[in-house]
């Protein structure tokens, strides 16, 4: 069983092909805050670590949404939405269980 936690974003995006990795039981898709450096950010890191401590032996994957996280919301938000939607589609296609 694979569960996804995501921000409510949905715009088409093609996910690049990467090396095959085992599917986690739970996949967190996290968009860092505006102005934060690339990655999950401090809140995303804390959330993922807290979740891992609560799910027993289930595996937790973490995906940092790739977007500018800038105050230019007209370009930043759509880019983040596209990347997050692409990751959701990628996980659904490659980790259907």
Where are the model-predicted features located?
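Sec-dependent N-terminal signal peptides
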Residues: 1-7
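C-terminal region of N-terminal signal peptides and the immediate post-cleavage residues
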Residues: 7-26
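Active-site catalytic motif of lipid deacylating hydrolases and related acyltransferases
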Residues: 23-96
């Amino acid at each position: 069983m694979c569960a996804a936690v995501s921000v409510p974003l949905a715009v088409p995006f093609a996910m690049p092909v990467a090396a095959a990795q085992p599917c986690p039981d739970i996949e967190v898709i996290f968009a860092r805050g505006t102005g934060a450096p690339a990655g999950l950010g401090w809140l995303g890191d804390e959330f993922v670590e807290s979740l891992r401590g609560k799910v027993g032996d289930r595996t937790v994957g973490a995906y940092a949404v790739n977007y500018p996280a800038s105050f230019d919301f007209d370009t930043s938000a759509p880019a983040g939405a596209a990347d997050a939607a692409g990751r959701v589609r990628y996980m659904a296609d490659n980790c259907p269980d």
